[in-house]
């Protein structure tokens, strides 16, 4: 397992791992974790659960050791069922397992992680093996389910959609929120992006769209780009620094959850120009704070966000600018979008996700 500081999949792992054992005291749960990728305080939370054991598995994800040494470690435990929370299951593991496939992005878009041909072949072999051998596949949206069917040739009946939730709920008190916003020198209204800075996030076009918004509509606002830089895509940060109004870009790397909650609470709206997603967790987090969403017109965003979002052409910075402007001068429309956002957020819960995942475990054992 990886920790919640490692983007959407890490969050997914931690939220399920911290909930499912509390729903099921008839079984023992063993969590394999990489010590360099899990926060000590999160390990303590899991260790304190009476039916949980923790085993260190310090193998780099997507590595040969993961396919061999981790395989040996799994076989030593004589497990009744394994849940691999991402596609990278050892291809020679032949005991019952469930796998979560969050998306098929690497089949759709090139990136540094798969640019070398042999790496891409390995990815395709591993994900195909996991999908074929799993008793059940969990995915996080109907859009991803359709992609899994299309690219892996898996029947619909084998795939179960279990929606994710948001762990950032409620509100931050005003004093704390102001302190955190002052910490990051946020003195102007701001749009907020949250996510790992991968190529698929299309951050450059988002920044260009915001740049056009400033040029065209002359509003005094910032774009806060918040999240975890990806070492495989260093060019993204370099290109962001070449934007004309780069002084209006506020870059916040890897904030703590309390800071992130305050950043959501203080934002004018959430925005993302992502090209492909499996779910879109940051937008769901934003909805919990009643933020209107201004996002790319992708199938998964339409599915998950529905009427809580304004949609733009992610390849057209001018359209991004125009859609950002829609919320500025119409307070009635802005408040209507806030209400829609809060109403939509009620359909997403980690407690429900944990319950549905446990039900799936019981079906396949």
Summary of predicted features, one role per range:
Residues 1-365:
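Carbohydrate transferase catalytic cores enriched for Leloir-type hexosyltransferases
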